[in-house]
Amino acid sequence: MAFVLSLLMALVLASYSPGGSLGCDLSQNHVLLGRQNLKLLGQMTRLSPRFCLQDRKDFGLPQEMVEGGQLQKDQAISVLHEMLQQCFNLFHTERSSAAWDTTLLEQLRTGLHQQLDDLDACLGQVMGKEDSDLRRMGPTLTVKKYFQGIHVYLQEKEYSDCAWEIVQVEMMRALSSISRLQKRLRKMGGDLNSP
């Protein structure tokens, strides 16, 4: 599961960074894969949102942190990786298999896995030994807590259809934030603090 999220993260990062700026070679295919994953997730809707209004919840997506330019390059890469990994983990459970169309779900899992694989190469080149420290603190820990809240919500709602629909909408927000962070990395040549 972690491998797939790593792949998704790699694809996203590749699509939003100029060649060589992050010390890795991610193709334009990575960007397209990120868009395809977002589209697949949108197609997974099974219930009208109006039927699930009572189940809505603010999960506290760390959107400002992800999109607001607060992250250094190595932190941004670690956050991208963690978000993709957690998305992959969420959709790679037995309970998610029962909730979604299996064909769409498998395509999403495959796309996330590919992005994580691509990002793993970049993560290793850019962060090296620092990665384990970055994953245990700061922004990456914030991402882990965000996804832990989603898992707790699903458990509390007993993995109901509406709970999964609410989570699906939230994951669309998360993947959109990932895309914006990738674009920012690409525009800034990997330097998130550039004007």
Curated annotation (Swiss-Prot):
One GO MF term:
cytokine activity
Cysteines joined through disulfide linkages:
24-122, 52-162
Q: Which residues form the signal peptide?
A: 1-23
> Which UniProt key words apply to this protein?
Antiviral defense, Cytokine, Disulfide bond, Hormone, Pregnancy, Secreted, Signal
Extract the PANTHER family matched here: INTERFERON OMEGA-1, TYPE I INTERFERON
Entry coiled-coil feature ranges: none
Q: What does the UniProt record say this protein does?
A: Paracrine hormone primarily responsible for maternal recognition of pregnancy. Interacts with endometrial receptors, probably type I interferon receptors, and blocks estrogen receptor expression, preventing the estrogen-induced increase in oxytocin receptor expression in the endometrium. This results in the suppression of the pulsatile endometrial release of the luteolytic hormone prostaglandin F2-alpha, hindering the regression of the corpus luteum (luteolysis) and therefore a return to ovarian cyclicity.
Native species:
Cervus elaphus
Q: Please name the GO terms of the biological process aspect recorded for this protein, alphabetically.
A: defense response to virus; female pregnancy
Question: Where, per UniProt, does this protein localize?
Answer: Secreted
Protein's recorded name: Interferon tau
Q: Which family does it belong to?
A: Belongs to the alpha/beta interferon family. IFN-alphaII subfamily.
General remark: IFN-tau genes are intronless. They evolved from IFN-omega genes in the ruminantia suborder and have continued to duplicate independently in different lineages of the ruminantia. They code for proteins very similar in sequence but with different biological potency and pattern of expression.
Where does the entry say this protein is expressed, by tissue? Constitutively and exclusively expressed in the mononuclear cells of the extraembryonic trophectoderm.
Q: Which GO terms describe its cellular component?
A: extracellular space
